Amino acid sequence: LINKLVEHLNSGNFANTFSNIKSENEIIDSFNLLTAKPMLYIANVDEDEILSNDYNLFSKKLQAYANQKDSLYLKICASIEQEISNFEKEEEKQFFLNEYKLSEPGLDKIIKYGFDLLGLQTFFTCGEKEVRSWTIPKNALAPEAAGRIHSDFQRGFIKADVFHYNDIIKYQSEKRLSELGLIRQEGKEYIVKDGDVL
């Protein structure tokens, strides 16, 4: 297996394209090879390319290469990202994004793509004084999410009140969410969703 893998790598191929056999992939994963990891290719392009939504020769080549390697590709403009980071007010930031016909900052996309590649998602906890985000694997059950906060919570988990981040942003009050029936109790078999508040 190792000789075949070395030959595969010496031919310019990545370790993540070596085998579709689960037992072989488990062995390869134990080597922690960089090319066995999921990859995201990011092209830093100029403002004109972002405005025109066109691709220059180099970004086209990088996109083709990423596609060939079955990887994700994203283009951003670092100078635009720098300007976005300087805005303090959300309205100013949104106006600037609209000028460039961008739905969201490139940094937000990088984070989303990264989480997706790594099979991760975020849930939140909130209290009167603090809101905190926690990272868990996708499809994690509620007790596993509770365990990220504290191991005792995982062992003693029975149920949790759950609502979604978008709902609390929209209605600004847990009391209002409760009145609207948007807070529910979930048990041990609940699969936590990205953006849940527990």
Segments from the language model and where they lie:
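C-terminal-of-GTPase-core extension/linker across diverse P-loop GTPases
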Residues: 1-191, 198
